[in-house]
Amino acid sequence: MAASNQNHLPPGLLESVCTIESNLNPTAIHHHDGNGDSLGICQIKYNTAKSLGFKGTEKDLMDPKTNIKYAAKYLAHQIHRYHGNIQKGLIAYNQGSAKDLTRSKYSDKVIKVYQRRLIACQDYTM
């Protein structure tokens, strides 16, 4: 994914996030009570994307390329915020400004999918 490269994310990490967030469904919407909806393939919130410079509408954010672009920015921001700690960055991506950055089921799921992708890539290149 170009967005991963542009944001210096490890190859396959953002795809693993999207797999857990929406099962790679670009039309996924998860409604939250009073906290904005999570939208699209990466399940990013509209206000989060706006805070990263997004100027479009919620409908525009449903475009997979746009959704991935802003999700990559947000994930990279969270990982950088926690000094390169991928697990803490994943927890913060999922929970917002996370207060408790201990291991979570969410980050464990993403890491497991990510590890499977890495193993599959290694098997393919051998």
Where are the regions a protein language model picked out?
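Catalytic glycan-binding domains that act on GlcNAc-containing polysaccharides
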Residues: 1-126
